[in-house]
Swiss-Prot record:
The keyword Repressor applies. This is HTH-type transcriptional repressor OpcR. GO terms for molecular function: DNA binding; DNA-binding transcription factor activity. Belongs to the GbsR family. InterPro entries: HTH-GbsR_regulator, HTH_MarR-typ, MJ1563, WH-like_DNA-bd_sf, WH_DNA-bd_sf. Negatively regulates the transcription of the opuC operon. In the absence of GbsR, is also a negative regulator of the opuB operon. Binds to an inverted repeat in the promoter region of the operons. Is not choline-responsive. Keywords: DNA-binding, Repressor, Transcription, Transcription regulation. The keyword Cell cycle does not apply.
Length: 185
């Protein structure tokens, strides 16, 4: 049986949606987030929770959780459309911006968590150095760990600057957006 043009189009869209869902794992996001991102993206206009629930087969409660996760990651937003009473959700149509949003959201969390851990460990180890009766071996190990923590902090500072490099879009001065795919031909 010969496929209709509509069948081929729907098949291609489904492949793209599935690939977007798979790619979300790279960013530490669940595939359900990627699936919803792909569905809204392919729809090319904002969608309601009911529409998304129907398109994914998920409950409205689960869909609400997924959309909230997407909003937290800055890859979706609630939008207003005159005459529509239900909440509408839309996604960034620019793949580059979606990448930057996901990259920044995930790495900002990592940086924040590790800076908190740095402060805690640095305080504990510095307090330990002030104690009497610390063996020379223990003191040496504490100093090694404190030096390691400084290197760690430098790394997370660099990572913070890298995030800013992407968020400011300065990255495009060095790695421009392309109009033609040179590497996929």
């Amino acid at each position: 049986m010969k496929k209709t043009a509509l069948d081929i189009i729907e098949h291609a869209e489904e492949h793209l949606i599935e690939k977007i869902a798979e790619n979300m794992h790279t960013f530490g996001m669940p595939s359900t987030v990627g699936r919803v991102l792909g569905i809204i993206y392919m729809n090319r206009k904002p969608m309601t929770l009911s529409e998304l629930s129907e398109a994914t087969g998920m409950s409205k409660t689960r869909m609400s959780q997924v959309v909230r996760e997407m909003i937290d990651a800055n890859i979706a937003e609630k939008v207003f459309e005159k005459g529509v009473r239900k909440d509408l959700y839309d996604v960034e149509q620019d793949y580059y911006q979606t990448f930057i949003s996901l990259f920044a959201a995930n790495w900002t969390k990592v940086v924040s968590k590790n800076k908190v851990l740095y402060k805690k460990l640095n305080r504990e180890l510095s307090d330990l150095l002030q104690r009497d009766g610390l063996t020379p071996e223990a003191e040496e190990k504490v100093n090694q760990l404190l030096n390691e923590l400084k290197e760690w902090l430098h790394y997370y500072d660099w990572l913070s600057r890298l995030i800013e490099f992407f968020e400011s879009e300065e990255v495009f001065r060095y790695v421009p957006k392309t109009k033609e795919c040179s590497s996929l031909k």
